[in-house]
């Protein structure tokens, strides 16, 4: 991550996992299914594992004989995942930077990444590294968020935070900045992949309440660091965001549509 506004530190990992899992779990199920339905493999490398939301689903969907190595650049996220899932057998944990992976060439049959490539400053290097560590014919499977306009709950909270900061929060540029299908195709193809397939997955996610969702987005992302740096307490922002979300999507539960772009490709 380039700077601390893209870092998941302090209480962010816990809030991210507690409040935002409902946003990520359906997409994790989809991605794990794609990995599991591919040709049989003996090893999977997960990049940007975060708090282990995809990791759990990969372990559940793949035979126990399949080796799973879960990595993340941010130590607090990796430590949280290890604490939460440390008792789950068949998972290896390792800190790793996606642009300089500490693994031999051709050592994995699949590389999976949920909502991580958007945050990598040198995306070409990350895809090149993914290609390097894949065996011949290995699978690359990842998702990224669709544009912000297709994820209206996030847009509502972004606008609320903007009203407090007096400007757009910088954090939101990264998660929703890699949705262009042509750019994705070119990035993947130019770094050695073939058989590229790109699709859109839209899922309705359900949060217990609008306040629950607002709390997750405000406190479970580096946007909270921007508020802190601006001397703004999170509670008034959460209250305002919850009210806006309830008006737009209802309350108890709060149902919102989320959209992601999913890419699969093969190493030659």
Model regions: which residues?
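N-terminal, positively charged/glycine-rich alpha-helical extensions of SAM-dependent methyltransferases
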Residues: 1-14
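Conserved Class I S-adenosyl-L-methionine
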Residues: 3-6, 23, 51-53, 177-268
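Class I SAM-dependent methyltransferase SAM/SAH-binding core
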Residues: 43-101, 125
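Conserved catalytic/acceptor-binding region of the Class I
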Residues: 124-125, 131, 135-208, 224-230
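A short SAM/SAH-binding and catalytic strip from SAM-dependent methyltransferases
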Residues: 109-123, 146
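Conserved alpha-helix/loop element of class I SAM-dependent methyltransferases that forms part
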Residues: 22-41, 57
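A short acidic, Gly/Pro-enriched loop at the edge of an enzyme's catalytic core
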Residues: 99-111
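A structural alpha-helix within SAM-dependent methyltransferase catalytic domains
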Residues: 32, 56-59, 127-131, 158
